[in-house]
Amino acid sequence: MTPHEIDIALGMEKYYYEDWNELDGTIERPNGFKVIEEIDFKPAQDWKGETKGKYAVFLLTKWGIDHFSAISEVQKVLHSKVNYIGIKDANAITSQLVYIPLNEKQELIEKYQSRSFILKFLGFSSKKLNHTGNIFEISLSISDFDIVIERIEQIKKNPYLPAFIGYQRFGTRRPITHLIGKYLLRRDWEKAFYLILTYPFLSESKETIDIRKLIMEGDFKEAVRSIPSKFKQEKLLLKNYMRFNSYYLALKSSFIPISLYLDAYQSYLFNLYLSRKLDEYKNLNDKVNLLIRIPIYFNNCDDVCKEIYLDEGIERNFFKLQEFKISLRDLVRKAFMNIRDLKVNEETKTISFVLERGMYATILLREILRGDPRKFT
């Protein structure tokens, strides 16, 4: 089966099981998609802190809010820079540990609740938290659940799937983060700026589409008045462009770290490479230790990598963005993800499983359900 056009646009050109057809299944978001950080092979909420230490550790449970907005809110509540282990899905119910450095004036909050997250103090720690993976529980709305069970049973016999970098890295509703990264690396500040603020997608709300159209038409004053506060990135960039009349200086003020856009472009290159090597890799016995390296230097590429780089127009020093003091490194990542504790509840039509840090549940859903990823992301 040929993957969906969104998959192709994100570099995911193949499935592992080529003969499976599309299933008409959806997931109710955020309630049907739960993610719990796994610390020392236990759920985050079971983490036991010490009575004292260098860091105060909290359990952050959030829903319907993106990672950076949630962290920004938590920092205001705790009056401190907040550290975290991983970036969790915005359109899900997620639980993870966050921690802050202690100082003499620090006043700790036992519990805090807002409309989109709950923060609960768990204890102290002086050592690095051992993030062993993420636990997923996903409820499907589907009539052909018997086929889902069959596919899961087949995957359990060989619990490895391609470790594609999932939709969240590129934007689930506007999958263009990697393109923004590409234009940043080309130093086309204007194109990167307008990709962030304009180019509306039909999956967005009418209000958002109308605002993006205002910016496209050059009506910045009306657009900046109309942008809801939750769109922090768009509002900040537009305000700073109006202030400095410079796309570069506007991008320098980015609420979202510029490095995330560049990482997304590297992720796209990884997906392309894995897609084109997948038939070869599927036949290898050792899927546990197989690593892929996406180098920053053309001369370190193999033939497949060189072909991709030539197609993309990647030149010498392409991965150095000195204007933002960013130098990317080689991207090294496992070729396959191991799916642990894969279980099915036929009564509730729920599947649960554990993935290593940095692996994406939506890639398992993609393999099982096929078709338009907007149904399950």
UniProtKB/Swiss-Prot annotation:
<dbReference type="GO" id="GO:0003723">
    <property type="term" value="F:RNA binding"/>
</dbReference>
<dbReference type="InterPro" id="IPR042214">
    <property type="entry name" value="TruD_catalytic"/>
</dbReference>
<dbReference type="GO" id="GO:0160150">
    <property type="term" value="F:tRNA pseudouridine(13) synthase activity"/>
</dbReference>
<comment type="similarity">
    <text>Belongs to the pseudouridine synthase TruD family.</text>
</comment>
<keyword id="KW-0413">Isomerase</keyword>
<dbReference type="Pfam" id="PF01142">
    <property type="entry name" value="TruD"/>
</dbReference>
<protein>
    <recommendedName>
        <fullName>Probable tRNA pseudouridine synthase D</fullName>
        <ecNumber>5.4.99.27</ecNumber>
    </recommendedName>
</protein>
<dbReference type="InterPro" id="IPR020103">
    <property type="entry name" value="PsdUridine_synth_cat_dom_sf"/>
</dbReference>
<dbReference type="GO" id="GO:0001522">
    <property type="term" value="P:pseudouridine synthesis"/>
</dbReference>
<feature type="active site" description="Nucleophile">
    <location>
        <position position="89"/>
    </location>
</feature>
<dbReference type="InterPro" id="IPR001656">
    <property type="entry name" value="PsdUridine_synth_TruD"/>
</dbReference>
<comment type="function">
    <text>Could be responsible for synthesis of pseudouridine from uracil-13 in transfer RNAs.</text>
</comment>
<dbReference type="GO" id="GO:0031119">
    <property type="term" value="P:tRNA pseudouridine synthesis"/>
</dbReference>
<keyword id="KW-0819">tRNA processing</keyword>
<dbReference type="InterPro" id="IPR011760">
    <property type="entry name" value="PsdUridine_synth_TruD_insert"/>
</dbReference>
<feature type="domain" description="TRUD">
    <location>
        <begin position="160"/>
        <end position="377"/>
    </location>
</feature>
<dbReference type="InterPro" id="IPR020119">
    <property type="entry name" value="PsdUridine_synth_TruD_CS"/>
</dbReference>
<dbReference type="GO" id="GO:0009982">
    <property type="term" value="F:pseudouridine synthase activity"/>
</dbReference>
